[in-house]
């Protein structure tokens, strides 16, 4: 046996696993009951496939025990039964398992949850397609105006383009206002790697194959019985192959592995999805606003931190960032080569039967002189087909650009341009023949398009390609550099000590630092000697800026123009980066020129509160202000600021973090208005509620009025990429709801923004919540031990899932060194989910107890204020996932005896707060139970409710064995003849972590 009987397994197991993921999972569109029926109908197939695979892959007696375990954990099995007895039966069944069978059980339940996740994704995709189809049938005459409908500003259900534009038309939003916003709109989605991305890329590939087969199986009801049987056999075969694939990473992925993983979504989905998004926008606009012109420029683009985020990740070197840029460029060039080849095949227009524009003919003559070999080869064939000839020249230039890019990747960033040895065909009469910028490529395509238009022709593939060029350019996604603020101050301290200045930088007070930095910025004298051997840290810091200059020199500024400073506290934190950038040639304050956008990241509550004062000091400085970029000559200078959800939540709890970020946005926008500066807020949202996650549509609508204005930048965490961008229609759903939310927030003045009394109420709630949270998390001396012993945090750190360490400082065990992502991951695995709700109940209770009328006020806020409704919705969703019975089992089984009394006190605090929070959330929403207002989500809750519990029991048993310091391996229990090593036990524990993450649809 591998498990001792738990000391406490009580009845409810709550609504535990329930899981609509904290991360952005698109809700099924339409009535919840309809989505629920879809799930029920299709679940039968998935469960049957799962059982078939287990019976074919496991010994008969083992397969039956696994199926029995699943049956015991189903909600329907508990109707009219004693839930305690079901829990005991689960425990007894697990007790009979040896380690090998326990590992098989963990794998089986992990597979089950991943199949259900795929099923739900398919339902979400099908629901979106159904909504698009029904939307086409329901024109505006079918929907008379409803005077009793809630104001648009308070509607937080995701809207399609068609729905939103019709609402805007009814609200008499002027076409000119909408057109102006579209011209200025700038949505940026920034993909990140994720330190707890749990699923191997190989397994992701298997999941996509299963999803594709499920789509084929279910999409066409006219398929014959034999066709369906064939597809079912393919599904069984693919799932069996998946079952025989190792779920765990065999080695720690490199940064370039992570780059490849992130770029997969561009290759497979986004490159083709973005033009579809634009077409849907144009079609919907034509129905409600036929006179509005949609600009060609991209309204939604992408960024990436994968390969460029070096904060706490020593593996991200300047060379890695350089290679990442080259890799992204090569991927785009390959796509463009393929697209141009297809266009050449299609545009067979002959000059005998069609006019051709003069500019196009003139360009062909220039191309003939530059590419005589191409002319010799193609002229005879395409003599009367100018478009094919032009595209042949275009294709040649793209291939030369590919060749140049390959040289750059191989040579590395430290090789100067003159150090490259280009092939002779790259140069003709001293002119470089490859595309030196994407503008040159776009110009060639526009020449072709303009010529076609002048003869009353259009070409949708060409329009699609031009749209892709506007969105992705040659870079695919802009790389943001991120580094922690201390790295820059440490480098300047070492530099000033070497220069033997009267006072070293590290010894200066903040006002002295600012004065010295300003003086250095305004001089043209170099500061950094070139022939000095610095410490490795300083050498790398300086090298990053030099690499950036070389990168922009070769690829243009679009590839990498943003530098994010994490843990920004003061004015000097930004000026330090500007000075280092000046030394590398990225910034010239004397000329008022900058090729780098310096972005402070304010993360802790104190820094969020301090942010307006820091930025006011900077924006009041002519030196700093002159270095802000301008989007165009007519637009104000742009300041980008990043707001950190993860660390502020870890620092002060969910409610306080969200309110401080909300308040900071208002104060920063007021400052920008006074200073005449355009503000772009960069939201560092994580996948989980404890790190700012949740439905993006609601989150964007909950932003204070006037803070979006068509500009927003948001991180898309690595762990949510598969759930949002693995399927084309899911990707379109997310992209469309992002866009409609930005449009709605920007165009519809929210008449229900917070009143002064609401602000005062929220300030009180945030303060009380923060106080209660910090009393437990930061001031309780036993909390760190509780977290380390009761959650699988140490085992999580052993998962080979990321190039980035889980802790900021190697070997450190304190809370401050632990990153926010594994902090949330640990609490999620053990079913506390504490960072996402703790402190909320105490704050709400204090308000209600002070005045009974405050409950009515809180209910009104929930109905009328999108920000408050978003908060309560997130807390409600999180509470539905908490399972304190299972969490108590973690504590009693894994906590050391000498901590028992202290841990019991901590658990009592958590349990009391949970009950209080749950009661008050239900009082505010007016619902009889959590998630009662969302039937589709509730069905998902019921589906996963207890099914995840056996994995929790298995995990505890394996962790207990693994951590038992009094029994060194090999281990042996009565009735178990096998000998186990620690590596085998660790493997089993890690598999349960995989399974629970799949069941929760969330890690950190």
From Swiss-Prot:
<keyword id="KW-0456">Lyase</keyword>
<dbReference type="InterPro" id="IPR015813">
    <property type="entry name" value="Pyrv/PenolPyrv_kinase-like_dom"/>
</dbReference>
<dbReference type="InterPro" id="IPR022805">
    <property type="entry name" value="PEP_COase_bac/pln-type"/>
</dbReference>
<dbReference type="InterPro" id="IPR018129">
    <property type="entry name" value="PEP_COase_Lys_AS"/>
</dbReference>
<comment type="function">
    <text>Forms oxaloacetate, a four-carbon dicarboxylic acid source for the tricarboxylic acid cycle.</text>
</comment>
<feature type="compositionally biased region" description="Low complexity">
    <location>
        <begin position="8"/>
        <end position="19"/>
    </location>
</feature>
<keyword id="KW-0120">Carbon dioxide fixation</keyword>
<dbReference type="InterPro" id="IPR021135">
    <property type="entry name" value="PEP_COase"/>
</dbReference>
<feature type="active site">
    <location>
        <position position="650"/>
    </location>
</feature>
<keyword id="KW-0460">Magnesium</keyword>
<dbReference type="GO" id="GO:0008964">
    <property type="term" value="F:phosphoenolpyruvate carboxylase activity"/>
</dbReference>
<dbReference type="GO" id="GO:0006099">
    <property type="term" value="P:tricarboxylic acid cycle"/>
</dbReference>
<feature type="active site">
    <location>
        <position position="194"/>
    </location>
</feature>
<dbReference type="GO" id="GO:0006107">
    <property type="term" value="P:oxaloacetate metabolic process"/>
</dbReference>
<dbReference type="GO" id="GO:0005829">
    <property type="term" value="C:cytosol"/>
</dbReference>
<dbReference type="InterPro" id="IPR033129">
    <property type="entry name" value="PEPCASE_His_AS"/>
</dbReference>
<dbReference type="GO" id="GO:0015977">
    <property type="term" value="P:carbon fixation"/>
</dbReference>
<protein>
    <recommendedName>
        <fullName>Phosphoenolpyruvate carboxylase</fullName>
        <ecNumber>4.1.1.31</ecNumber>
    </recommendedName>
</protein>
<comment type="similarity">
    <text>Belongs to the PEPCase type 1 family.</text>
</comment>
<dbReference type="Pfam" id="PF00311">
    <property type="entry name" value="PEPcase"/>
</dbReference>
<dbReference type="GO" id="GO:0000287">
    <property type="term" value="F:magnesium ion binding"/>
</dbReference>
<feature type="region of interest" description="Disordered">
    <location>
        <begin position="1"/>
        <end position="25"/>
    </location>
</feature>
């Amino acid at each position: 046996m591998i498990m001792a009987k738990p000391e406490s397994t009580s009845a409810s197991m709550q609504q535990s696993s329930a899981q609509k993921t904290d991360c952005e999972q698109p809700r099924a569109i339409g009535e919840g009951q309809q989505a629920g029926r879809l799930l029920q109908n299709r679940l039968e197939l998935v469960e049957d496939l799962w059982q078939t695979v287990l019976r074919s892959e496991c010994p008969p007696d083992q397969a039956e025990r696994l199926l029995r375990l699943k049956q015991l954990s189903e909600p329907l099995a508990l109707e009219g039964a004693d839930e305690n007895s079901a829990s005991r039966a689960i425990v007894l069944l697990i007790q009979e398992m040896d380690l090998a069978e326990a590992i098989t059980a963990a794998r089986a339940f992990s597979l089950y949850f991943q199949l259900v996740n795929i099923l739900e994704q398919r339902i979400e995709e099908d629901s979106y397609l159904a909504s698009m189809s029904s939307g086409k049938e329901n024109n505006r005459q079918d929907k008379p105006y409803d005077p009793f409908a809630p104001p648009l500003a308070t509607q937080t259900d995701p809207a399609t383009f068609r729905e939103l534009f019709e609402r805007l038309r009814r609200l008499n939003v002027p076409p000119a206002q909408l057109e102006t916003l579209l011209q200025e709109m700038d949505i940026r989605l920034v993909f990140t790697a994720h330190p707890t991305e749990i699923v191997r890329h190989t397994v992701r590939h298997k999941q996509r194959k299963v999803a594709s087969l499920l789509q084929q199986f279910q999409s066409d009801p006219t398929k014959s019985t034999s066709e369906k049987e064939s597809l079912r056999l393919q599904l069984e075969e693919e799932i069996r192959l998946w079952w025989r694939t190792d779920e765990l990473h065999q080695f720690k992925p490199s940064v370039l592995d992570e780059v490849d993983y992130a770029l997969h979504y561009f290759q497979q989905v986004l490159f083709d999805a973005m033009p579809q998004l634009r077409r849907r926008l144009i079609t919907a606009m034509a129905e409600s606003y036929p006179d509005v012109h949609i600009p060609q420029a991209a309204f939604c683009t992408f960024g990436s931190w994968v390969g460029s985020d070096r904060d706490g990740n020593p593996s991200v070197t300047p060379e890695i960032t350089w290679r990442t840029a080259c890799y992204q460029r090569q991927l785009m060039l390959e796509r463009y080569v393929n697209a141009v080849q297809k266009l050449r095949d299609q545009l067979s227009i002959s000059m005998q039967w069609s006019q051709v524009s003069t500019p196009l003919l003139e360009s062909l003559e220039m191309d003939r002189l530059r590419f005589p070999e191409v002319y010799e080869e193609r002229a005879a064939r395409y003599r009367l087909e100018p478009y094919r000839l032009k595209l042949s020249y275009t294709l040649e230039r793209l291939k030369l650009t590919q060749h140049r890019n390959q040289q750059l990747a191989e040579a590395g960033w430290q090789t100067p341009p003159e150090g490259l040895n280009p092939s002779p065909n790259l140069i003709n009469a001293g002119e470089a023949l490859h595309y030196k910028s994407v503008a040159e490529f776009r110009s060639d395509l526009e020449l072709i398009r303009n010529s076609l238009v002048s003869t009353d022709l259009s070409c949708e593939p060409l329009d699609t390609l031009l749209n892709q060029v506007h969105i992705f350019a040659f870079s695919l996604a802009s790389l943001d550099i991120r580094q922690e603020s201390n790295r820059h101050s440490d480098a300047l301290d070492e530099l000033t000590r070497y220069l033997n200045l009267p006072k070293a930088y590290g010894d200066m007070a903040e006002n002295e630092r600012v004065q010295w930095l300003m003086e250095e910025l305004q001089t043209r004298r170099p500061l950094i000697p070139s022939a000095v051997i610095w410490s490795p840290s300083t050498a790398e810091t300086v090298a990053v800026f030099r690499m950036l200059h070389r990168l922009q020199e070769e690829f243009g500024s679009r590839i990498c123009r943003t530098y994010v400073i994490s843990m920004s506290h003061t004015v000097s934190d930004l000026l330090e980066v500007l000075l280092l950038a000046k030394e590398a040639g990225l910034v010239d304050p004397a000329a008022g020129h900058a090729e780098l956008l310096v972005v402070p990241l304010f993360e802790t509550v104190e820094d969020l509160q301090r942010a307006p004062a820091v930025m006011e000091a900077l924006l009041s400085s002519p030196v700093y202000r002159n270095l802000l970029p301008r989007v165009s000559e007519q637009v104000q200078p742009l300041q980008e600021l990043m707001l950190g959800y993860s660390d502020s939540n870890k620092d002060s709890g969910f409610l306080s973090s969200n309110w401080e970020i909300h308040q900071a946005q208002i104060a920063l926008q007021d400052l920008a208005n006074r200073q005449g500066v355009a503000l772009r807020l960069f939201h560092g949202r994580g996948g989980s509620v404890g790190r700012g996650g949740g439905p993006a549509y609601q989150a964007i609508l909950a932003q204070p009025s006037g803070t979006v204005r068509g500009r927003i930048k948001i991180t898309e965490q690595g762990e949510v990429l598969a759930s949002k961008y693995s399927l084309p229609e899911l990707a379109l759903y997310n992209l469309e709801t992002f866009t409609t939310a930005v449009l709605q927030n920007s165009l519809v003045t929210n008449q229900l923004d917070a009143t002064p009394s609401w602000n005062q109420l929220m300030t009180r709630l945030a303060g009380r919540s923060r106080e209660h949270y910090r009393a437990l998390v930061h001031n309780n001396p036993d909390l760190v031990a509780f977290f380390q012993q009761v959650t699988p945090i140490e085992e999580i750190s052993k998962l080979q899932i990321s190039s980035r360490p889980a802790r900021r400082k190697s070997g450190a065990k304190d809370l401050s060194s632990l990153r926010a992502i594994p902090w949330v991951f640990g609490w999620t695995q053990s079913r506390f989910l504490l960072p996402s709700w703790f402190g909320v109940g105490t704050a709400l209770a204090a308000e209600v107890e002070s005045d009974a009328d405050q409950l009515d006020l809180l209910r009104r806020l929930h109905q009328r204020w999108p920000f408050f409704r978003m908060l309560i919705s997130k807390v409600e969703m999180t509470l539905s996932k908490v399972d304190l019975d299972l969490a108590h089992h973690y504590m009693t089984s894994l906590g050391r005896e000498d901590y028992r009394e202290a841990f019991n006190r901590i658990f009592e605090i958590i349990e009391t707060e949970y009950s209080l929070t749950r009661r008050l959330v239900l009082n505010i929403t007016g619902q009889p139970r959590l998630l009662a207002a969302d039937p589709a989500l509730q069905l998902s809750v019921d589906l996963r409710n207890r099914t995840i519990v056996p994995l929790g029991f298995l995990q505890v048993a394996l962790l207990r064995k693994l951590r038992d310091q009094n029994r060194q391996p090999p281990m042996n229990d009565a009735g178990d003849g096998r000998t186990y090593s620690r590596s085998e036990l660790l493997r089993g524990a890690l598999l349960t972590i995989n399974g629970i993450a799949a069941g929760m649809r969330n890690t950190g």
